[in-house]
Structure formats: C-alpha cells, structure tokens
A protein has these predicted regions:
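Compositional signal for N-terminal targeting/processing segments
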Residues: 3-247
Length: 247
C-alpha cells in the first residue's frame, strides 16, 4: 500500500515537472512595430532541432525573397567571424573548432551543425554577426592566432576579438554571472554591428529572453536587449517567437 502511494506520488511529481519544464518554452505573442521594420528578431530556445529547422526556413525565405544577407546570432563576435571564413572554405576544419570548443553548451548539437551547413549550401552569401560576450575563450584565442598568422594583428578584427574575450572574462569573474553586464554588452555589440550596415534590413536569432522589444521586465535592474534596442533605434523591430511559429 505504501509502495503504491509512493509510486503514484513520484509519477505525479514527474508529470508536473514535465509540465513545468515544457512551460518554460513560452509561446509568446509577436510584436509588430508601428514603423517599417528593418530589424527582424526571432526568439528561440537553443539547440532544438525543430526550432533550428524553422529558423533556417525563415532565413532562406528572407535571403531569397527579401535579399537579406546579414544574420545576427547569439554568439561571440569571433565565432561569427570564423563562420564567415568557413563559408568560403572547402572543408569543415573551422566549423569543427567551433563545435568542439562548444562541448558542454546548448550549441554543441548535431542540429546546430546542420543549421550552419544548410546555410553554407543554400545561402552561401550569408554574413554572420555575433553580438554576445566571449563565452568560449578557447575559440577567441584560436581566432587571434589565425589573425596573427595572416598578418592581421593590428586589425580591427583583432581588437574586437580581444575586447570580446575580456567581456566574457568579466561576466564569469569570481564564479558569478553578471547578467546585467552581459545584457548591456549585447546591446552595445549589436549597435556596433548594425550601425555599419547603414539601415540595411537584418534578421536576428536570439534566446527568447533577449528578443522581445515589448518585454518591459528587468534582470538585475536592467532591461533586456531588444527593449533597449527599441529605445535606441525607435519602433523598427519586429519580433516573433520560434516556439509560437512551430506550434
């Protein structure tokens, strides 16, 4: 009798845990700006096959029908630069460096590799823009070595990579995650990249917690990335949740 009660209790706990875990992937409402959009953001939960498939479908559509070439992603500046080099290379050596260094993260999945490979095959003129802090120091150091070997130690790329690595060091300093600092860095990095494009329309893929310009919630007294970008650029950001689009 006691065993039966315990079994039922455990099953109920598992059921409600599953409901809670699934519910974290909220199907948020889209946001359409009052002005003509030039920044199209999609919010995701990282590493899931169905979400990455939808993201590729959306990017290919904008690439082919709208002529977009600039894809902003929630990764490091230097990782995006390496992806841009890899798009022109005949092999996957650089992609494998990125993938192997991402071991233990949500980006270390076959689905993520497939996403990049499909872009290389079907959208080869894509230009990646990475606007996150330097999470994976090893990848940044690889790119610094690459730049040095190619006579680019005094380049802007080298300077930005060093800055990006230091952003990551500060975020992880003393074993504490400074989320407000990261969010502000993501905003600064996004603005730096976007302002070089002179108003060209872009698509961006970010974690859902960063991507909604109508989300007024704060983390450590700091608004999330898209809300800050809306305040900076005005109402030109369109947002849709990949969770909603795959329902």
């Amino acid at each position: 009798m006691i065993f039966t009660i315990v079994t039922i209790a455990v099953l109920l706990m598992l059921f409600f845990f599953q409901r809670w875990y699934t519910s974290r992937e909220i199907a948020r409402e889209p946001y359409y700006p009052s002005n003509a959009a030039t920044i199209y953001l999609y919010g995701e939960y990282h590493g899931k096959q169905e979400y990455l498939d939808k993201e590729f479908e959306l990017w290919k559509l904008r690439y082919e029908q709208n002529g977009m070439r600039d894809l902003f992603i929630e990764t490091e500046y230097y990782t995006a630069q390496m992806l841009n080099i890899w798009l022109r290379e005949p092999d996957d050596e650089i992609l494998n460096v990125i993938y192997n260094n991402n071991e233990g993260t949500l980006m270390h999945t076959e689905a993520q590799l497939d996403f990049y490979r499909k872009i290389k095959e079907e959208c080869p003129e894509t230009v990646f823009h990475g606007t996150d802090i330097g999470h994976i120091r090893e990848t940044g150091e690889w790119y610094l070595d690459y730049l040095e070997e190619n006579g680019m130690k005094n380049s802007r790329e080298y300077e930005l990579t060093k800055e990006n690595i230091l952003q990551g060091d500060k975020f992880y300093a003393n074993g504490e995650l400074d989320n407000a600092y990261r969010e502000n860095c993501m905003v600064e990095n996004f603005i730096r990249e976007y302002d070089t494009l002179n108003g060209t329309a872009i698509m961006g893929i970010y974690g859902d917690g960063h991507a909604d310009p109508s989300d007024e919630s704060v983390d450590d007294n700091t608004h999330h990335m898209a809300f800050q970008l809306r305040e900076h650029y005005g109402d030109i950001i369109q947002y849709e949740s990949i969770v909603t689009l795959t329902k």
